[in-house]
Amino acid sequence: MNRALGGNDENAMLMYFGYSYPEYIASNYFDANNHIFHTLLVNLMSSWFGEENALAIRFPTFVFGIACLWMIYLTALELFHSRKIANTALLIAAVNPVHIHYSQTARGYSLVMFFSIAVIYYSLKLLQSSKKRKEIIPLAICGFLSVYVLPTNVFFLFGLAIWLATILLVPSFLEEYGIPKEERRNKAIYFFGAAAFIALTSFLAYSPVLEEMQETARAHQLLTLDTQTGSAINLTTSIIKKIFQGPLLWFVPFLIAGAFFGSRIHRPRLLLLLTIYFVPLIITLITGIGGYPRNYLFNLPLLALFLAAGFFKAGDWIEKRTGLHGEKNRVAWWIAAFYATISLGIVLFEYYPSIQVPDPTFYQKNVRQMTSSNDLLLISDPKNFLYARITARKTLLQIIQDNKLTGVKAILPNSANIEEYEIFTTKGPFPIFNGLPNLQDLHSISLDEERKMISITGNESISVLSKDFEADSQWQKVSGNGEFLKLDTHVLFGKHSLEVRASSEQRMVLGAPVRGNFPIVKPSLIVLTWASKKFDRKTIAYHPILIAQAEFNGTIQTFQMKTGKINDGINIQIKENPSSSETYHWFVRSAIGILPPGRYTFKIMLNCDAGQRILYDGLRLFFIELA
């Protein structure tokens, strides 16, 4: 559990959401990796114990994974009224490789499993209880939180609702649960109240991101009746293969046997298994909103129960036909032991070796030691972000605060060269250093067995803009209509920020000249930094544009410098100092470009779409010679 962070989508969750602020986590859903309730827990743990504390960040999933085992045990007692089945179901889940994996990986799936089996447990308690009503509260809370972790878990709740409605509407099912007909109405009211609470709280919790969720769902793995019926059928079997991996598939026949546990078929129990498994798949098929098999891991606890029952059903059948009837349940225990042995074999000899990664401590320490306080870090691979993020964030903020740049260094895989490094432009990734001379001979320093650091510039830079450029400059409208204001109420750096507000009819472009002429003797790197705050999720906070004017072959030419963002995926958010009004969180960005030799003058331009409002601060511009 204390292995390096970053695998199995942990990297995306942490970079996009986990290291942000709670308000941002709860109001953004541009990527399906945001299991909001789980992400909030991760954010809490990282703020308490540190962003790189793997144990703390994975602790919520571990706790819910352990709690899930206990809830499986309790549900087995309610569903089968057998302690031996409950013990076996507990064993099955405890050694299951998938349950182990998601109980020590910072993703929301162990929470999904816990809340789902908890909802089933409290539904059974409420269904069979004649007087107690206290189960309504945990039922409603667990139902809401299951959806707040993973929105598609609402499909599971629909399946459970159909099962409960069937139980209350079919007289023979009422008899099997010993529910008097006169209590049916009260039971229905209780369940309807819980459902209303879940629906209302889920709607309120997701209301800031409903539109964004729809867009994300459309861009995600979709299964529709018209186009991918075959994929939906494959998903039916993929869920089983996900839960029972490798040789554990041999035990699926016991799962079928468990559905028929007992001296006679318990129809409500069989119906529970079928509705929980197939109703979500049918909804996925109809709506076209689905996901990977792991999205359906709410099935794992229930399948563990029926698999345990299947071991005893098969054991009884074998004992009766082999003359071992006097050795009560010995065969079932042997089957369970065989299952546990195979599961542990997969865990020990396949799963754990597959997640072994180098200790990041050496990498983290070397990045920190080899980076000066005002160096800019270029990190080529998102996999290398996590344990260099704190240093990259700290130095970027120091560069802006001091208005000073002392060097630019790149972190690359050992097998890569600097020519492969890409910046992110509006037209896509661009290899900015490709074709430049002498870069192949740059000296590299080893960070660990897999990564290296290259210093790609000298140590002297030209700081082009003043510390309060936003307020000191003569901004003018270049095109469009709107207004711009210098603010002293919301400031991240210096004394003022710049508010750009375009009219509702036209986008607006602002421009401000950069004072001075800049003779560039050798090919140099442009480094541009800024902070922005937008007020609408759909607003595009365009990065500042650098317009250059230079003389080439006796002709003065004006052109836009090609710059692109670096370290795309490291979301650096900074909270401004508290003011008399609302306190804002700002995104801090940086971009680079290549500046050929010449004598230049420059202009900074800012773009704002119609009807939008953006704040800018921390504008800094540096020129530094390439090594």
Describe these PLM feature segments:
Residues 141, 196, 266-267, 305, ...:
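Signature aromatic-anchored transmembrane alpha helix within multi-pass, membrane-resident enzymes
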Residues 68-70, 164-175, 245-269:
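Hydrophobic, aromatic-rich transmembrane alpha-helices
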Residues 80, 119-138, 146, 168-178, ...:
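Membrane-interface transmembrane helices that cradle and orient dolichyl/undecaprenyl
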Residues 152, 203, 207, 333-453:
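Catalytic lumenal/periplasmic loop and adjoining terminal transmembrane helix
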Residues 59-80, 118:
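Transmembrane-helix motifs of polytopic, lipid-linked glycan transferases
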Residues 103, 110-112, 117, 155, ...:
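Hydrophobic/aromatic-rich transmembrane helices and adjacent perimembrane loops
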Residues 89-90, 135-156, 197:
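Membrane-interface alpha helices of multi-pass inner-membrane proteins
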Residues 87, 93-94, 143, 190-199, ...:
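Transmembrane alpha-helix segments characteristic
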